[in-house]
Amino acid sequence: MRMSFYQFLMTQRNPNSADEVQQFANNAFFDTTFPKHSEDFDEISHYLEENADYLPSMTIFDEAWQRYIDAMN
């Protein structure tokens, strides 16, 4: 079974890191309304654009998404 993007993102958490994707993961962990079961780029992207004040740039999401795709293949 393929893991959701959120499940993958949680593997990227590191509270002591300056890596932007890891910071995104750290912040997403505290986002109680994040679409935790989604594997859909558009759904997650739309959610982040509308709700994630903690994400300074969608480029960070794009990088995290690429890591997710690479890990799933």
From Swiss-Prot:
Cysteine disulfide links: none
Cited Gene3D superfamilies: YozE SAM-like (1.10.150.260)
Highest taxon above the source species: Bacteria
SUPFAM superfamilies (alphabetical): YozE-like (SSF140652)
Entry's family note: Belongs to the UPF0346 family.
HAMAP family in UniProt: UPF0346
The protein, known as: UPF0346 protein Lreu_0775
Species of the source: Limosilactobacillus reuteri (strain DSM 20016) (Lactobacillus reuteri)
Organism phylogeny: Bacteria, Bacillati, Bacillota, Bacilli, Lactobacillales
